[in-house]
Amino acid sequence: MKESLDFAISGAEIEIADKSVQMALDAGASAAMVSLDKAKTEIYALLDGEIDNIRQTGDRSLTFNIYADGKYGTFSTNRFEEDSLRDFLCKAVETVRMLVADPFRGLPDKKDLATDAVNGDEMGLCWYGYDSVSRDEKLEMARRVSVFGEFSAPSSDRNWRVVSEEVEYNNTLSDTYLTSSDGCRCRQTETSFEVSSQVTVEDNDGNKYTGLWWDYGVSPEKVLTSECGRKAVEMAVMQISPVNADKGKYTMVVSRLVSGRLLQPVLNALSSLSVYQKSSFLVDALGKQVFSKGLNVMDMPLEKGKSGAILFETDGRACRNREIITDGVVKENFTSIYMSRKLGIPPTSSCPNRPVLQPFVSEELLGGERGGGHCGVNGDGFDGSGLGGDCGGVRGDGRGSELGVASGAGFGAASGDGRGVERGAASGDGRGVERGEMSGSGLGGDCGGDCGEVFGAVNGGERGVEFGAVNGGERGTELAGGLGAERGLKADPFVNEIAQKDILELCGSGILVTDFNGGNCNSATGDFSYGVSGFLFENGKITSPIDSMLITGNMTDLWNSLLAAGSDPVPGMSRQIPTLAFRDVTFNA
């Protein structure tokens, strides 16, 4: 296998990026940094099993941070000719000089720069066989996922049929090179292969339900064996015949596919800029316990081969694994170089690179046998005992369960942040959603691998066809367990994995949230209101889907009511947030 990629940044492009820094200095800049970003995406889309469209997009740009006379500006161009660049940078410097001076703007200290991101493949997110996959093979990967022909016709064996199916295969190569007048030289190269299926099913009464699933990998192995078409159908069918749940306070379990939605407002509130502007509900939280002792969040960008892994910040500083929240205590805010200088505090990360929420089960759920606890992570500067964990690791390997396997690039192109890692849509494919949170459902405890070979126990009724060929009638005994086998509680959740099914069993009864349907959180107060959908569960088992409901409350209060956090975040997502459970959440019809 060759160790080069056809569309990756070339030596000539690196040379022009380095030269452009000197051009900026020659034009009168006191300092300059440039990010060279390059991305290519190929998309093969099927509609109802037939080719709908084939698209290819490519992007290449230079983004400059220009400093001159104590002033600062950002400029971008896709012109790489030296004469054009020289003229562009002269005008850029002239423009910067028109701005108001800001003494806090400047490049990072040289001692803080990353020095080990040399070739771009250090984090193991690049597959050098990328160019060897043929057009026919890519199209076949899309066709293999389609199940429209199998389930589009009415059948006496089921009370539904697939009326629409959209399958999309895409592969993306993204490459970033960062260089500056202070000697920064950093590179990150990533490849991704992905296939997704979105289906709409119609029941016998004409009601329609939508389900979506996806599979992803740095190389195509996982895509080649993907069953996401069938899983998407499962997601849709499980929503048939929803009931109206009574309003009130419920134990809320949140699927790992959408749980990141609840942590994001907390991470946003930890921005030093938001704190400085008093637009954060965590203004005075640093160093204080403001959340449940069970909440432990780390930023872990140095986990090689994992989604979101990277060696350098967007300003060229070396990344570090960091404690963000430990035992409910806010340990760090996200502080850029600029805010560091403005506020006179040490810099940290400008934003979370790869947030990881650690496993936890409360004393309330364990019945006092073990007491609440969470699992520490060893290595990379962290000691499990230092995080207060009373266990070596959820899988007994001292690592707190590895929390994710696959690695990640988003749907595609770099979006000006110098990364190209899960930052939105691939070169105009219009998605702009992070994988895993695009799902309208997200059921099944171990859906990353064995997501419900049976449809599960929803209403105990007629829906009945099982993709895993299990009995063909009663819908199985549990939605989250695969093949309908009864699984008792594990004797010690700190030795084994903690999946959604375990948390449902521990919680007993409540509402499982599998999707957020709009809503927002007030960044200044933490008050939130979200539309949600999902399932009622009783005695640890799913009973029926529910119509959309509204949850309301306050983020600080919500995270103080944390009952459990699983060890099951979705591989391939940069935010490693597992299944979550909260007590006494207010639901309204």
Predicted segments with their positions:
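N-terminal small-residue-enriched
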Residues: M1-G404, G408-G412, G416-G424, G428-R435, ...
